[in-house]
């Protein structure tokens, strides 16, 4: 019987080795597998290479992993934001390596790994520092740069629902990099809001087939923290 579910986030990230390359889904906070990241921090793996769209927000999620000094190198598109103080401090101190990749190239390099493509030519980045050391070619009068696929040992992603076979459905913008990362990693670990019985997922709605998923853990959404406003406080 195929059953890819595990009981806890700790069990989901068990066995991740020091020095692993890990893709982490999310576009900012949308689709960020925060509970899996917290479990990874507790698990203790170090010297990691992280692939993500950015380099963390505030001091939670990916930023918490950076702050715990578990990351040696990060591959991303938007490392600096108004609340990227953890990344900024580590990078300026020389404690974190950065490979900057244009967002479209990042998505396609990940997709190429999952599709078995050995590389692709793109005009994005030609003539800039991002193209230094890479093969270039002129095709039909236009200049291109050869980009290589990005493979990973693990992918940590977030989905809305799954069944025990690992079939996934995402919620709106939380989908982002999840599907391509799932196909590009040797081991894909997914946190979901709800695990449903086989047959409950509409086959036409499944985005990531279970063949790309290794482990699934159900994580109930946290209750929102709402502070009473001034008007509410006045009437207490």
Describe the residue ranges of each PLM region:
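Conserved alpha/beta enzyme-core scaffold
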Residues: 1-236
């Amino acid at each position: 019987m195929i059953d890819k579910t595990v009981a806890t986030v700790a069990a989901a990230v068990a066995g991740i080795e020091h020095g692993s390359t890990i893709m982490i889904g999310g576009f900012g906070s949308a689709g960020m597998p925060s509970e899996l990241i917290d479990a990874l921090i507790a698990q203790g793996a170090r010297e990691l290479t992280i692939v993500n769209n950015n380099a963390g927000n505030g001091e939670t999620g990916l930023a918490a992993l950076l702050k715990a000094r578990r990351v040696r190198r990060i591959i991303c598109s938007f490392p600096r934001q108004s609340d990227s103080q953890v990344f900024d401090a580590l990078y300026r101190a020389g404690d974190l390596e950065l490979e900057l990749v244009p967002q479209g190239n990042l998505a396609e390099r990940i997709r190429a790994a999952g599709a078995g493509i050995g590389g692709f030519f793109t005009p994005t980045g030609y003539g800039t520092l991002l193209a230094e050391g890479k093969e270039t070619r002129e095709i039909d009068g236009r200049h291109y740069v050869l980009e290589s696929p990005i493979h990973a040992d693990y992918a940590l992603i977030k989905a809305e629902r799954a069944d025990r076979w690992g079939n996934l459905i995402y919620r709106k913008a939380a989908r982002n990099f999840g599907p391509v990362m799932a196909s590009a990693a040797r081991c894909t670990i997914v946190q979901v809001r709800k695990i449903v019985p086989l047959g409950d997922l509409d086959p036409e709605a499944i985005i990531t087939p279970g063949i790309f998923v290794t482990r699934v853990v159900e994580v109930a959404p946290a209750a929102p923290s709402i502070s009473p406003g001034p008007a509410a406080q006045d009437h207490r």
